[in-house]
UniProtKB/Swiss-Prot annotation:
The gene is HIGD1A. The modification N-acetylserine is found at S2. It comes from the Eukaryota. Associates with cytochrome c oxidase (COX, complex IV); proposed complex component. Also associates with respiratory chain supercomplexes. One of its GO terms (cellular component) is mitochondrion. Signal peptide: none annotated. It is found in: Mitochondrion membrane; Mitochondrion inner membrane. Induction: By hypoxia. It holds the Pfam family HIG_1_N. It is a multi-pass membrane protein. This is HIG1 domain family member 1A, mitochondrial. The modification Phosphoserine is found at S8. PANTHER family: HIG1 DOMAIN FAMILY MEMBER 1A, MITOCHONDRIAL, HYPOXIA-INDUCBILE GENE 1 HIG1 -RELATED. Proposed subunit of cytochrome c oxidase (COX, complex IV), which is the terminal component of the mitochondrial respiratory chain that catalyzes the reduction of oxygen to water. May play a role in the assembly of respiratory supercomplexes.
Length: 93
């Protein structure tokens, strides 16, 4: 009885750096969304000291909503870009 399933694996393994670069080229708005999320959270934490008389919970909720809105916007633009690439920019055979 043979245990060979007929699946062949590539003879090389892709390191994490090249895999990240390849994935960023396939979906360019994912790194943009992650970077925007990190920037908004960093800015919100920086402005935490000068929030005035706003409650901490309200400030954190506003920061979370802004970060999530940026990520959803980046996902929407990325989806539109990939649809454009696939349906309109693709040459007709």
């Amino acid at each position: 009885m043979s245990t060979d399933t007929g699946v062949s694996l590539p003879s090389y393994e892709e390191d994490q750096g090249s895999k990240l670069i390849r994935k960023a080229k396939e979906a360019p708005f994912v790194p943009v969304g992650i970077a925007g999320f990190a920037a908004i959270v960093a800015y919100g934490l920086y402005k935490l000291k000068s929030r005035g008389n706003t409650k901490m919970s309200i400030h954190l909720i506003h920061m979370r909503v802004a970060a999530q809105g940026f990520v959803v916007g980046a996902m929407t633009v990325g989806m539109g870009y990939s649809m454009y690439r696939e349906f309109w920019a693709k040459p007709k055979p």
